A protein has these predicted regions:
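A short beta-strand-loop micro-motif that forms or neighbors metal/cofactor-
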Residues: 78
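Short S/T/G/P-rich N-terminal loop/turn motif that feeds into the first structured element of a domain
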Residues: 1-49, 60-67, 81-187
Length: 187
């Protein structure tokens, strides 16, 4: 499973345009295989920003969606017209924990890890950002990026201890922004 985390900062007054593109893309996205989960969240510290969080079966499914011509037109409109900034992180899930089950945290990769906690309340983690679902108010996700295995292990255990219902750790393969596209895939 692969996670995609699209943090976006629409220009003032452009959030409705973002959702117009979302509505236009829904039936097209439904035709693509591999999307497991999609929700949109507002950061608790910035009501003008948004996170689109997606889980995909594999990298090929993400590539197929990224290459869709209608989606590419929306991407271009976002970059050129609607967004002040964005950040996209993509990576494979390398660990999954719940209140009753867990994977071995000792086998995590060494760096570029993103700890993601899900639950009915924001989880307070060091250097993390918490978001509330736009589609399902009262559902939260907390993202904690960390560069080393030991810190990610501590944060994961702390999040479960705070009541996170579900926790996933992703090894980030690509991390790029509107202005730094050095890790962006080629069109």
């Amino acid at each position: 499973m692969h996670g995609l985390f699209f943090d976006v900062e629409p220009k003032p007054g452009h959030m409705p345009h973002y959702f117009t593109h979302v509505d236009r893309l829904k039936p097209i996205l439904a035709q693509h295989k591999g999307l497991v989960f999609l929700d949109r969240y507002r950061p608790l510290d910035d009501a003008g920003a948004l996170l689109s969080h997606q889980l995909w079966a594999d990298e090929e499914a993400i590539a197929s969606w990224r290459a869709d011509s209608t989606h590419r037109a929306s991407q271009s409109a976002g970059r050129k017209i609607h967004f002040d900034g964005y950040r996209i992180r993509v990576g494979a899930m390398v660990a999954h924990l719940t209140q009753t089950e867990s994977t071995n945290l000792e086998d995590l990769p060494a760096d570029r890890l993103l700890v993601v906690a899900y639950g009915r309340a924001p989880i307070l983690l060091a250097h993390a950002r918490a978001y509330e679902s736009v589609n399902n108010p009262g559902r939260f996700v907390t993202l904690a990026p960390h560069g080393d295995r030991a810190t990610a292990q501590v944060l994961a255990r702390d999040a479960i201890g705070q009541g996170a219902e579900d926790l996933r750790i992703f090894a980030v393969a690509r991390d790029y922004t509107l202005t730094d596209r050095s890790e962006a895939p080629n069109p």
